[in-house]
Amino acid sequence: MQVIIISGLSGSGKSIALKVLEDSGYYCVDNLPASLLVVLINHLQTQQHAYVAVAIDMRSGENITVLPWQLKMIDKSIQIKFIFLEARTETLMQRFSETRRRHPLSDKNITLEEAIRREREALATLTGLGHHIDTSSLRPNVLRAFIKDFIADSRSPSQLTLLFQSFGYKHGIPLDADLVFDIRCLPNPFYDPQLKELTGHDPEVIRFMESQPDASKMLRDISSFLGTWLPAYIRDNRAYLTVAIGCTGGQHRSVYFAEKLALHFHDSAHVLVRHRGLAEYKPHYARR
């Protein structure tokens, strides 16, 4: 039996993630009080459900800090995957404004910003339980695609998933990054009029990057660092490791680096690539 637990901040995309799981054949339970997790799983196991997804957050009004204890009580034969979704405060405020929904912790005595802050503090102990996704810059279709890839990976044999994410510093560092590499010191294709509108996927940009000695050296250095320490993360039983590569806009250099690193480590782990700065990006697994 496999159980995917979804938690995170209100407005971060939990409903979207749960709907994708439901459409993928998971038996889904929304807004479960954390104290009932073990009871629910034991019951569903007797009903022979193979794939279960559960959303647990602040809506139940219960103390969610019992969740880590509940997870320890689950039978070891059951595979547990945990997804924590969050977004920047300004992004969440904009989403609540657009949908005109009420934040579950808001009342007439506190502002929306204060409600978000309180929820973030209450959920802080859960951020390290599993895979952490910052949805601040993710469109709904992009989040759906990522959850689908997460499902595909969860149904494969257990192994570290290594996620390479390109991003632009002008939009902020991804909240879910475990390691961050800043490559803004490298020559920028953006200033070449013939390359400005292209991306790190395009052959012209690839040739430009490959012609830069510093880019090649930095790529080797990052590869060497990850190659040295990746076995330690695997020995630590990490399920996910997110490596963020940042340039100015997240369009050229970081995209090129993320793709190159993904190919380099293709045989060392389940490798997933995500490009936050590309409007039409879809998450994908590296292929040789």
From Swiss-Prot:
User: Pfam families this protein is in?
Assistant: PapZ_C, RapZ-like_N
Indicate which residues the UniProt annotation says bind GTP.
D57, M58, R59, S60
Signal peptide bounds: none
Q: Identify a single GO molecular function assigned to this protein.
A: ATP binding
- The protein depicted here goes by the name Nucleotide-binding protein NE1849
Q: Which UniProt keywords apply?
A: ATP-binding, GTP-binding, Nucleotide-binding
Cross-referenced HAMAP family: RapZ_like
SUPFAM superfamilies referenced in this protein's UniProt entry, alphabetically? P-loop containing nucleoside triphosphate hydrolases (SSF52540)
Provide the binding site for ATP: G8, L9, S10, G11, S12, G13, K14, S15
Q: What does this protein do?
A: Displays ATPase and GTPase activities.
Q: Which family does it belong to?
A: Belongs to the RapZ-like family.
Which InterPro entries does this UniProt record tie to the protein?
P-loop_NTPase, RapZ-like, RapZ-like_N, RapZ_C
Q: Could you tell me which species this protein originates from?
A: Nitrosomonas europaea (strain ATCC 19718 / CIP 103999 / KCTC 2705 / NBRC 14298)
Cysteine pairs bridged by disulfides in the record: none
